[in-house]
Amino acid sequence: MFSKKPHGDVKKSTQKVLDTKKDALTRLKHLRIVIENAESIDLKQFFDQHFSHIYYVFFENFVTIEASLKQKGHKSQREELDAILFIFEKILQLLPERIHQRWQFHSIGLILKKLLHTGNSLKIRREGVRLFLLWLQALQNNCSREQLWMFSCLIPGFSAPQSEYGPRTLDNLINPPLNLQETQVTIEEITPLVPPQSGDKGQEDLTSYFLEALLKYIVIQVKSLEWKNKENQERGFSFLFSHFKKYYLPYIFPNICKENSLYHPVLDIPQMRPKPHYVMIKKDAETNEAIYCTKEPFIKARVIVIRWLVSFWLEPKPHTGPHIPGMEGEVLPKNIQ
């Protein structure tokens, strides 16, 4: 076990991770050494055997860093947050079977709410989206309604899902409204970990920004979860994509024909669509050219989804594809290649 040893004796670091007499920060440093120098198979086995120690080390250090961020909030504390989130990601990736059984369900959910808080910087919120999708990919059907509501609120600009409690937004899911008639005991309010800094680059279109992130992460993270049964990777993707279709596609493509199918296409000529109405929204500061936009909502989101789908259909194969005269330099669809 632990055949790679470019950084000292990894076995000694393993022992120090498990040594409860050592402080949490020391154990964290040695846990990082183990993660960075162990073979992937050995690392999976190590996490499976010592999951309780590993989560304790992570959580104790996360709490310390959170308190430090709220007191100081300097660049060094933000770098420490990035480092502890690396450990958090490894926990999500290497322990999907336990997470699927709701291991540390409330603790992990609380941490993700702190990352997804709308008062955080865009970088932290986007990282929260990425880690939340990893968690949901592991939970699959063992998640609760709250996680599905949160998934439906990850991309701002869409209608809030309805429930018996009224509209559900990311804000009231992270910090539910108080009802003092039910109980006098209230949970502590969740506050931002890293508010936007003065030099942070903003985004004019948050809907497009988070939509692109969500579509990217539900694909590229599929194989990052180390399931013992590899079929769960595809199940995890199917779970996320089915809920994307449920919560977002009806708004992005409100007039989509549900009767259409790749296997049983409708070949009738469709009715003419009305011509879109464009309005000038602003002028370019450098060129003074007018910038127009259609009044139709989610038009940019529609373009993003279409481009995302096309990226899987048009895949460049520079050396393996056949030569077709007149198509030099063109990217050919897979069915032509």
From Swiss-Prot:
Keyword Membrane carried by entry: no
Instruction: Supply the alphabetized keyword list.
Output: Cytoplasm, GTPase activation, Nucleus
Cellular compartments annotated: Cytoplasm; Nucleus
Q: Which GO terms describe its molecular function?
A: GTPase activator activity
The source's superkingdom equals Eukaryota
Instruction: Output the InterPro entries linked to this UniProt entry.
Output: Tuberin/Ral-act_asu
Taken from the UniProt entry, a GO cellular component term is:
cytoplasm
Q: Which GO BP terms, alphabetically?
A: activation of GTPase activity
- State its role: Catalytic subunit of the heterodimeric RalGAP1 complex which acts as a GTPase activator for the Ras-like small GTPases RALA and RALB.
Q: How would you summarize the oligomeric state and partners of this protein? A: Component of the heterodimeric RalGAP1 complex with RALGAPB. Heterodimerization is required for activity. Interacts with the HLH region of TCF3/isoform E12.
Identification of the protein by name: Ral GTPase-activating protein subunit alpha-1
What is the organism of origin for this protein?
Answer: Sus scrofa (Pig)
Source taxonomy:
Eukaryota, Metazoa, Chordata, Craniata, Vertebrata
Gene, per the UniProt record: RALGAPA1
